[in-house]
Amino acid sequence: MHRQRHAQTSLYWQDDRSFELPVSYYHAVNNWGTSPGFSATVPNFNRLIGTDCFECHSSYISHKKNTAAGDHYFAADAAVEILDKNSLVLGIGCQRCHGPAAAHVNFHTENPGKQTAGHITANKTLNRQQQLDQCAVCHSGNDKRKIQSRFMFRPGDLLANYFLPAAVADSTRHFDVHGNQF
């Protein structure tokens, strides 16, 4: 089971939108500090947490786009995410890395004596690229253009089917606080 190893950041809800708090708890120093990307001197409580964040920092959240006309630049519609906070599955569960588990759970519920895991993807059955892509779906940074939701990714899928290559960006203007960990 995945747990917070480095830091823990909280959020708050305002209607159907969530916002990141500017302080985080850092386990290495056993203390609170400024959350990544926030100013240490100017408090900001307006950093919107959208589906992209939940796709790697939770197991699931139901969401939809609400396109509403309004007073916007060039009269364009504004797409606003509507998150269902009651559907949020906190933490990273088994299915995020091993795929859908309903058949696995049903089989082992009916056969409690069976000790061999079945009806679920074991990492050793994936080739090297599939294993790398499975981790990279969340640990390769946020500099690529997403084609489809990370929630749809299943073991054995190719990362190239989820993201387009990144355009060269000015790293000082669009800093990725995730550090491209992969």
Task: For each feature predicted by the language model, list its residue ranges.
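Short, flexible loop/turn elements at secondary-structure junctions
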Residues: 25-27, 57, 98, 139
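Membrane-entry segments of alpha-helical transmembrane domains in multi-pass membrane proteins
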Residues: 39-49, 87-90
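Primarily the internal scaffold of c-type cytochrome electron-transfer domains
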Residues: 1-3, 9-14, 35-37, 62-182
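C-terminal substrate/ligand-recognition segments
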Residues: 48-50, 54-64
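A cross-kingdom signal targeting lumenal/periplasmic-facing segments of multi-pass membrane
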Residues: 1-40, 48, 55
